[in-house]
């Protein structure tokens, strides 16, 4: 519902336009699409650590499609990046229900998730940035 609301109100398009304008200012022309793909992934990964992964995917998918449209790029790799990043909720017990469950039952501390989750998130980001553009061209 949130994703549809963002799409119907134009909020997704507005966020996409502003994001692309900001990246246009920072990144040279050739690398804009990959920089935006990385940005979409990183924002999604950050949100999924503090919100439900399903909610983040629903929220970010219309924005990712809008970003791709603004760039004149294929939207599929951007949506794939959202799905990969939304599923990479490793650094906190909040983003995924199983993490919350083992957090309580297993007696883990918040820092335990950070110690293991941050390196795992970095690894997933690097792999995603190498694989996504190869399998789903921008």
What does each model-identified segment do?
Residues 1-138:
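Transmembrane helical cores of multi-pass ion-transport proteins
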């Amino acid at each position: 519902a949130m994703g549809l609301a963002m799409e119907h109100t134009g909020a997704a398009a507005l966020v996409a336009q502003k994001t692309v304008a900001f990246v246009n200012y920072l990144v040279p022309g050739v690398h804009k699409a990959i920089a935006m793909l990385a940005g979409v992934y990183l924002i999604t990964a950050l949100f999924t650590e503090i919100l439900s992964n399903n909610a983040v995917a629903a929220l970010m998918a219309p924005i990712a499609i809008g970003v791709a449209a603004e760039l004149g790029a294929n939207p599929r790799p951007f949506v794939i990046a959202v799905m990969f990043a939304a599923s990479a909720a490793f650094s906190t017990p909040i983003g995924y229900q199983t993490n919350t469950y083992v957090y309580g039952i297993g007696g883990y501390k918040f820092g335990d998730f950070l110690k293991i989750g941050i390196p795992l998130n970095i690894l997933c980001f690097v792999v995603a940035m190498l694989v996504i553009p190869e399998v789903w061209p921008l």
